[in-house]
């Protein structure tokens, strides 16, 4: 995502009838629910979504109303005088403002590009964990997550929530357990974003495999929710946020996993590395060789717990990803409206219209179905239940 700041996005505010979408989702998750009831096992087999179901596992709220930026600006200005800090309930944003913020952007693009729904979280670069202290992050995360919840309530057919965690440099991630539990149990969220570097590009905290992270992993396993490894804004001028810091975070996380026994300790923990896995697929041979030289298990063992998304913005990149990484480990994603918003002059299409690349890849239909929907339903076990609970019409129709 681009650094936090107001964005405008114009477009049509009308919506298509909700009935068609709900029918698609209901058909898509029917096999999933049936398999759970019949098998009664904690790790269900992948569901069998109906043709056309497309789940975008990586979307951020990047078209926020101006009032949210004003609240955050007040919060940052009060860091030296906490008595002046705004309270969460000082933020006043109407439902109409929320609708206006997404109807001409995310919802319009969902309709145009054929995406069924988006797993939605606060702006990644806006998490700003390097700003202030743990109390700052706690208040900011709560405000940000509550807005996502309101959007998922207004548009239950379009958005399902994933939470921002109140991480802070030098603070053990155990402090994030309460917000994660609140978001999952009270707000109906189905996952979280984990920042491997809350310092914003200075990498001062322990790696993701350090035992200081174990309390949050224990809570994730208890709640049966996955995490997406996602850095926030860069506070280091050496690293452009979306062009360097993001890809560095993705690649660094994968190498940390190779050199650790994290998944021996948490065999059911599921972690998603976004942006196509950073540099990992391109250097797959390097990582296989390093694992071998270090007497670590083969990468196929790591893939029991690690997944990659498709936020890769050209056809050759997606072709490489799908040739190197098994289809079972790839989740469809676009990150729209996100890091790259322009039109590719070579194709005449938007860079972030990633569904076109999956459609254009040389894949068997079974693999395409897995990437578009089946894998998301498997990696996010709470997704099917969340969608089933939302079949009753409410809010503004799609």
Locate the predicted segments by residue.
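Glycine-enriched alpha-helix->loop->beta-strand junction motifs that scaffold or abut catalytic
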Residues: 187-190, 223-225, 268, 303, ...
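Active-site gating/metal-coordination segments in enzymes
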Residues: 116-253
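Hydrophobic faces of well-ordered beta-strands that scaffold small-molecule active sites
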Residues: 55-59, 118-120, 161-163, 192-194, ...
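Short aromatic-enriched loop/helix-cap "lid" or pocket-rim segments at secondary-structure transitions
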Residues: 65-70, 132, 204-206, 239-242, ...
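Catalytic metal-binding/acid-base residues of hydrolase active sites
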Residues: 60, 197-199, 232-233, 277, ...
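Mid-to-C-terminal alpha-helical segments outside catalytic/metal-binding sites
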Residues: 2-36, 41-53, 57, 66-117, ...
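Aromatic-lined glycan-binding groove of carbohydrate-active enzymes
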Residues: 261, 267-301
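Proline-centered flexible-loop/turn and helix-kink motifs
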Residues: 156-157, 188, 215, 264-268, ...
């Amino acid at each position: 995502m681009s650094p936090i700041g107001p964005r405008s996005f114009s477009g049509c505010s009308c919506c298509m009838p909700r009935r068609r979408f709900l029918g698609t989702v209901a058909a898509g998750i029917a096999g999933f629910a049936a398999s759970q009831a019949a098998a009664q096992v904690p790790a269900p087999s992948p569901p069998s979504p109906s043709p056309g179901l497309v789940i975008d596992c990586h979307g951020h709220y990047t078209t926020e109303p101006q009032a949210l930026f004003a609240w955050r600006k007040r919060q940052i200005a009060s860091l030296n005088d906490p008595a002046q800090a705004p309270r969460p309930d000082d933020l006043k944003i109407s439902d109409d403002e929320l609708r206006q913020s997404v109807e001409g952007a995310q919802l319009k693009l969902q309709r145009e590009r054929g995406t069924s729904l988006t797993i939605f979280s606060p702006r990644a670069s806006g998490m700003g964990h390097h700003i202030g202290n743990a109390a700052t992050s706690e208040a900011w995360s709560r405000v940000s997550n509550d807005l996502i919840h309101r959007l998922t309530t207004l548009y239950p057919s379009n958005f399902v929530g994933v939470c921002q965690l109140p991480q802070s440099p030098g603070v053990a991630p155990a402090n994030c357990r309460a917000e994660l539990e609140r978001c999952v149990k009270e707000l109906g969220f189905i996952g979280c974003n984990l920042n491997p570097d809350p310092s914003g590009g200075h990498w001062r905290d322990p790696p993701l495999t350090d035992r200081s992270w174990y309390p949050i992993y224990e809570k994730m396993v208890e709640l049966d929710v996955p995490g997406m490894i996602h850095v926030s804004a860069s506070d280091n001028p050496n690293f452009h946020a979306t062009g360097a810091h993001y890809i560095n975070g993705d690649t660094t996380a994968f190498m940390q996993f190779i050199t650790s026994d994290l998944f021996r300790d948490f065999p059911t923990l599921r972690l998603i590395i976004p942006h196509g896995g950073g540099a990992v697929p391109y250097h797959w041979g390097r990582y296989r060789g390093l694992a071998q030289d270090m007497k670590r298990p083969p990468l196929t063992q790591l893939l029991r717990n690690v997944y990659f998304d498709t936020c890769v913005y050209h056809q050759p990149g997606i072709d490489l990803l799908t040739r190197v990484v098994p289809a079972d480990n790839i989740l469809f994603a676009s990150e729209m409206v996100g890091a790259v918003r322009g039109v590719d002059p070579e194709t005449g299409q938007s860079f972030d219209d990633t569904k076109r690349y999956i459609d254009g890849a040389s894949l068997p239909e079974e693999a395409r179905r897995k990437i578009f929907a089946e894998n998301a339903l498997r990696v996010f076990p709470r997704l099917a239940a969340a969608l089933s609970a939302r079949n009753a019409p409410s809010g503004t129709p799609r």
